[in-house]
Amino acid sequence: MAIEKKFVNDGYVKASMDEYFAEQLSRAGYGGMELNRTPMGTQIVIYSEKPGMVIGKAGKVIRKLTRDVANKYSLENPQIDAQEVKRPELNAQMMASRLAASIERGWYFRKAGHNTLRAVMNAGALGCEVVISGKLTGARSRVEKFVDGYIKHSGNPVEEVVDEGFAVAVKKLGTLGCKVRIIQPGVVLPDSYKVRESVEVEEPAEKPAEKPAEKPAEKAAAPKKEAAKARAPAPAPEAPAPAPEAPAPAPVEEAEVAEPEEAEEVQAETSEEIEGAELVYVEGSDEVRRQVNGVWQHKHGSYDYWHPMARVHKEAKE
């Protein structure tokens, strides 16, 4: 047998066997079958709402099905297993059979279609499509569709993720075809995607720089430095220039001159700060200058100790 004919024959056997089981097990709630060929024989799994009716009393029904399948389809050592469907609302074949039974009992087709669609979606399906075709309300045949959720109609995903069931409802005006297509919950569709939420990355807070520990000598010099600034006299204001007509020059206010003891104390207090100060020597004189805490100081001649340059010296008496 050519390979093409073998595939056609296998498909015919499977479709014919499915119709046979649907006819024989309609009262048991037939929900589809699986056919697996193995070296040990042919394994057939029947899904049913009532597996007890598939097996029958003392296995009578299942033995009859096994004999009929072996003789009708020439299968070697067929083994039939019955399994229960826990959620019939997600089985397309069962829902199609229920829809056909509802229409045969006299339900209006639109009410039956909406009830079937609602039951499937409430069970958690991603999508469902119910199609009823035939003489619905008049002499002409027409098609009514009820769709909810997401349904694939073409491509390879139709064979992989879409469960399809079909049943026939026989009425006085004629037969009605009932088709139900379901996409099971949890199925990952090929065109599905997820949008990642932007995550804000928090920058670590900068720790304040730790100040180096002060040396004991610097700590002790700080209060002395403040005391020296407080005791230093403010510079005297400049005297106005004498008028040219006045014979005698205007008297100049004498600034307080630090006593030798005070000068020695200031010199002792500030000697520790001279290390970082830069000395400036004035050319042509014995004056030496430096800047301490933003104040220019100098020493020269008879005033051989550091004192502010803004201080007015007492004039030497003739």
UniProtKB/Swiss-Prot annotation:
SUPFAM superfamilies on file: Prokaryotic type KH domain (KH-domain type II) (SSF54814), Ribosomal protein S3 C-terminal domain (SSF54821)
What InterPro entries does the database record attribute to this sequence? KH_dom (IPR004087), KH_dom-like_a/b (IPR015946), KH_dom_type_2 (IPR004044), KH_sf_prok-type (IPR009019), Ribosomal_S3_C_sf (IPR036419), Ribosomal_uS3_arc (IPR027488), Ribosomal_uS3_C (IPR001351), Ribosomal_uS3_euk/arc (IPR005703)
Q: Which Gene Ontology molecular-function terms are recorded?
A: rRNA binding; structural constituent of ribosome
GO biological processes: translation
Q: Which Pfam families match?
A: KH_2, Ribosomal_S3_C
**Which key words are in the record?**
Ribonucleoprotein, Ribosomal protein, RNA-binding, rRNA-binding
Which residue intervals are annotated with compositional bias (Acidic residues) in the record? 253-275
Which residues fall in a compositionally biased region of kind Pro residues?
234-250
Where is the sequence biased in composition, kind Basic and acidic residues? 198-229
Quick one: where's region Disordered?
198-275
Residue ranges constituting the KH type-2 domain according to the UniProt record: 17-86
Q: Which Gene3D superfamilies match?
A: 3.30.300.20, Ribosomal protein S3, C-terminal domain (3.30.1140.32)
| Annotated SMART domains | KH
Could you say which protein family the record assigns here? Belongs to the universal ribosomal protein uS3 family.
What is the stated purpose of this protein? Answer: Binds the lower part of the 30S subunit head.
Which PANTHER family did the record assign? 30S/40S RIBOSOMAL PROTEIN S3 (PTHR11760), SMALL RIBOSOMAL SUBUNIT PROTEIN US3 (PTHR11760:SF32)
Self-association or partners: how does it assemble? Part of the 30S ribosomal subunit.
Protein name as annotated: Small ribosomal subunit protein uS3
Q: Which organism is it from?
A: Methanosarcina acetivorans (strain ATCC 35395 / DSM 2834 / JCM 12185 / C2A)
Query: Gene name on record?
Result: rps3
